[in-house]
């Protein structure tokens, strides 16, 4: 592994080989040696590990994953644990809430014990909603959302209908449930040195299936949520694609303003890079990064302006012709080129 002398401001505890914007991607625990060599060839130095086996959410397993990836010069930035992410028991105060919060707390402790200092959390009670897929540029499979004809999905569970959980929930209930959870989680995160970035709702609309998306579906909700948490360890995982789905009108500010605000507060921990055809309320589809309504160079430039030195990852990587690595290679190359471009514009890497 190359020397890593540069501490990251975005997530203290991590060190990088170079200052400034970092580039990573999602990695399976079952990645082959060739998969990891491919990441080396792309100069990917940060991994978002997706662990689907519940029995492997232990500090010992995390250490094993970390040691293997580091032998290829790749550091784990985040471990995904879907068992404590988008959990209706927590979001809606369903039976088993306290047990799920305790599971979340143990997850944080396991991360810290394994030398992993960041996790992404989302607070959706009924999953990510879509309408289906269509052909994008060159026939690539592209996710579509028409809010009038959509259903939710989270790790295989489908959500449909006017009330996905039996009744309509109020905004006050959602806020009370968030506050109950975050006041238990934040002190543990601080004690363990783990940083939690909260992901926007996808899609960020007022309500779906009787559940308001009033907290992480708009800018003012984010601000209030961070004030309630009142913790340096609770911040934002900014999904650019989700913010673009809502647009400036739906979210309250555009994605550039959001970056400047959260980055200026040192609350920006991680960034998901994705583009879409247009903002709601009209139906939209996901696009290649260079083919949506947002100029992604301006997004990267805003990240550079606030001296963001956390990881940017490609989100919803397109399944291109040419094999499973083609979409990843396109995405990483596009992101790395933008990083190089904005660094050249500023004359140096962030923090240099």
Question: What positions do the PLM features span?
Answer:
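Non-cysteine beta-strand/loop elements that form the S-adenosyl-L-methionine
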Residues: 45, 50, 77-81, 121, ...
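Catalytic domains of carbohydrate-active enzymes, especially glycoside hydrolases
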Residues: 29-52, 68-72, 113-119
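Active-site-proximal loop/turn and secondary-structure-junction residues that shape catalytic pockets
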Residues: 29-31, 53, 82-84, 123-127, ...
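Histidine-acidic metal/acid-base catalytic patches
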Residues: 2-22, 70, 88-90, 98, ...
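Active-site-proximal, glycine-rich beta->alpha crossover segments in alpha/beta enzymes
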Residues: 106, 110-180
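A short glycine/small-residue-enriched secondary-structure motif
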Residues: 41-45, 75-91
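Glycine-rich, proline-tolerant flexible connector loops at the mouths of alpha/beta enzymes
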Residues: 50-64, 127-130
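Aromatic-lined substrate-binding rim segments of carbohydrate-active enzymes
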Residues: 58-73, 78-79
